[in-house]
């Protein structure tokens, strides 16, 4: 649990300012979608997989299964074949069908809004739920993925490895208006500059205020 003090808060303010200057304040998920259900399915598929790979699969997937009901009654083997280029496709196909069935039985075929309802769906954890809450419903939420975990620790915003604790730490110090876009901005920073091995600190626009800069 990180201590909230003046030094940390000053760093938070400057980091958020520079992220907005570098990437813009209107960033949203990289997963292509046209509605809440498509984003839900795409996010389930994105676990342990790149967004670009998911975006290659979803156009034909949603053409074959255009509605919640189509997924709910899908043959698992056929769905597996449709998503076989994505990792863990056996488990994901089962979860997607179960998710669609629960949406039909419990939520009238609509994607629910609350965290509690979202995580009750098969294949949906806090990360996926917060992607939906932020990008679809504009509910302030923080998505903790591998990039957010790594870079938030490097910036001194958290000292935990637990995604729930990291989420709580960030909620205490980040301005609420920044919660949704912080994740997307940090993902881009992590993919291009602040990589897991060999971060490019000399190229980073945060190097002068980052406690971990080399």
Place the predicted regions along the sequence by residue:
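Catalytic cores of DNA base-excision repair glycosylases
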Residues: 2-214
């Amino acid at each position: 649990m990180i201590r909230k003090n003046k030094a940390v808060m000053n760093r938070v303010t400057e980091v958020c300012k520079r992220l907005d200057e570098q990437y813009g304040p209107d960033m949203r998920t990289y997963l292509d979608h046209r509605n809440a259900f498509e984003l839900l399915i795409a996010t389930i598929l994105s676990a342990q997989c790149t967004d670009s790979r998911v975006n290659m699969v979803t156009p034909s997937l949603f053409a074959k299964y255009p509605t919640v009901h189509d997924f709910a009654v899908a043959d698992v083997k056929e769905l597996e074949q449709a998503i076989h280029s994505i990792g863990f496709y056996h488990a994901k196909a089962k979860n997607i069908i179960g998710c669609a069935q629960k949406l039909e039985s419990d939520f009238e075929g609509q994607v629910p809004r609350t965290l509690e309802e979202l995580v009750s769906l098969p294949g949906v954890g806090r990360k996926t739920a917060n992607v939906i809450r932020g990008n679809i419903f504009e509910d302030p939420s923080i998505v903790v993925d591998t990039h957010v975990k790594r870079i938030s620790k490097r910036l001194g915003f958290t000292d935990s490895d637990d995604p729930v604790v990291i989420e709580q730490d960030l909620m205490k110090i980040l301005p609420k208006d920044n919660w949704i876009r912080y994740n997307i901005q940090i993902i881009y920073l992590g993919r291009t500059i602040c990589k897991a091995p060999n971060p490019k600190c000399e190229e980073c626009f945060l190097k002068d205020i980052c406690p971990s800069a080399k």
